[in-house]
Amino acid sequence: MKFTTASEVDLGHEKVGKLLFMLAIPAILSQIVNLLYNVVDRMYIGHIQDVGAIALTGVGVCLPIIMIVSAFACLVGMGGAPRASIYMGKQDNPTAEKIMGNCFIALIMISLTLTVCLLAFQTPLLQLFQASSKTIVYAKQYMGIYALGTIFVQMTLGMNAFISCQGFSKTSMMTVLIGAILNIILDPIFIFGFNMGVKGAALATIISQAISAIWVIHFLSGKQTVLKLKKENFKIVPSLLFPSLALGIAPFVMQSTESLISLCFNMQLSKFGGDVAIGSMTILTSVMQFAMMPIQGLTQGGQPIISYNFGAKNGQRVKKGFLLQTLCCFTYASIIWILVELFPQVFISIFTNDPELMAMASWAIRIYMACVLLMGLQISCQQTFIAFGNAKISVFLAIFRKIIVLIPLIFILPNILSDHIFAVFVAEPIADFIAVSTTVTLFIKNFKQTLAQMSYE
């Protein structure tokens, strides 16, 4: 039988361990480097002379909005790519190409809409996310420029998923490597060399994203790719696009609810601790994102293996892929937990040298990331549901942890505990523990049923 995946890997026959290594390592590097687009900005901004702490807090206010922009890329890309991978497993590449073409046009339409909205409602949005009279100056400087590069963000994040789902892991990694390395180079030049400050950080980011977007579109239009962008597929077909968006709802909810959570955290921290508390949360969020990226990358690398073999009805390879992926996720998360609990100041000093900000963030991070060792299980199970095309359970789990558990705790705990700031931060690990317990319980039952059904068929 001729397999219609990329020539780099054989998702149907290669050893699962070797496959996971080949796909996960580039995906992990891609996730880490991709995060550097924003994290590097914060690292440099936090060390701007005299105004670093307040400028960092201002950019931190922009993060929830940036998450919303990324969420729409997840809606289309992370919904369409697994479906394309499933059809490749069924030896139906023409349908997979049509799905990709529909997603490409959808991303363009979403990008234009988001750009107009961000520019038109910039001030009220920033005020909604708790920008103070001091921080809104820097928030507007960053967001005003970043909004203009929305289409580049959508193309890079959304369409790169279609490179990865074909097995072109190295090419997928190059997408973010090119842009992120350029961003790392341009940031100090624009921020300090041209004395542009926060504006320079935003400009460096969108230039870098633009180069990455060009790379993605060039590859998907070239000769090397299995699935190719074709003009005849640029017409929206509801029967192809809507199921992809339905599958993308889970990652969309996971990403967009992070924005809602940031709003809730900022509201409470602004009330009890002011700009210093919000600045601390900016740092904690940055460290948490950076810590979780390898897990996201590992499950992203494992997803094509699971999706392809699910489509090919190969239950044994699906099981091996999931178990190995989960073991790696849990091991990594445990190491991160130990490092954060023992050496919190090391992580905080990356973003600031302000004494007041360092003092609060150093004790807060130990609380905020107390249950991070369990998140490997959570993410592995949740991403495997997506690999199976099981949108309903994925959406429920995404909503359960953040909307049903975490957000109520953010508002309830300060009314119970005397230390209000501590109460806000401790909501995170409590929600993590409850969510992991629920996810693992549901997954075990569903996974057994899925394997049994595949064996029967």
Which ranges hold each PLM region?
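Short alpha-helical transmembrane segments in multi-pass integral membrane proteins
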Residues: 1-24, 84-149, 193-249, 306-371, ...
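N-terminal transmembrane alpha-helices
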Residues: 11-43, 47-51, 64-83, 108-115, ...
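Residue-level signal for transmembrane alpha-helical positions in Major Facilitator Superfamily
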Residues: 21, 36-37, 76, 117-121, ...
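Transmembrane helical elements of multi-pass membrane transporters/channels
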Residues: 22-41, 145, 179, 208-212, ...
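Helix-terminus/linker motif at the lipid-water interface of multi-pass membrane proteins
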Residues: 32, 36-57, 126-133, 189-196, ...
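Alpha-helical transmembrane segments of multipass membrane proteins
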Residues: 39-43, 116, 124, 158-162, ...
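Small-residue-rich hydrophobic transmembrane alpha-helices
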Residues: 56-116, 153-172, 280-338, 342-344, ...
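Short runs within selected transmembrane alpha-helices of multi-pass transporters and secretion channels
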Residues: 146-164, 172-180, 201-214, 296-300, ...
